[in-house]
């Protein structure tokens, strides 16, 4: 699945969870994906959300994409990885 195809499937889910900003990073963006690669997604919600909301988003994305998904928030990025991730991210929302 290419980036545009991912975006088309992901956006309706992100809108339901009131995500105001989102990006894909990792192997999909770097062109290193394999058949069993997960999809790494960064999100920022419109308002305060709970850990259950984040888990619900992850589960729904995995069901939608039929693939393992890692969901991180922009605020949760580790300082040592933040610059690299932000440089390679492909904004989808």
Regions found by a protein language model. Give the residues of each.
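Short hydrophobic/aromatic patches at helix-to-coil boundaries
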Residues: 87-93
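Conserved beta-strand core positions
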Residues: 22, 39-41, 69
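Helical scaffold of the NTase/Pol beta-like nucleotidyltransferase catalytic core
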Residues: 1-21
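Metal-dependent nucleotidyltransferase catalytic core
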Residues: 45-75, 80
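Short, charged recognition helix plus adjacent turn
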Residues: 80-87
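Catalytic metal-binding acidic patch
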Residues: 26, 32-50
């Amino acid at each position: 699945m290419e980036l545009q195809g991912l975006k088309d499937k992901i956006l309706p889910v992100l809108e339901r969870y009131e995500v105001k900003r989102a990006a894909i990073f990792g192997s999909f963006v770097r062109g290193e994906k394999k058949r069993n690669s997960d999809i790494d997604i960064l999100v920022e919600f419109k308002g305060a959300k709970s850990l259950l909301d984040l888990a619900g988003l992850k589960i729904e994305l995995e069901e939608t994409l039929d693939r393992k998904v890692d969901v991180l928030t922009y605020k949760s990025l580790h300082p040592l990885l933040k610059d690299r991730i932000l440089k390679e991210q492909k904004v989808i929302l």
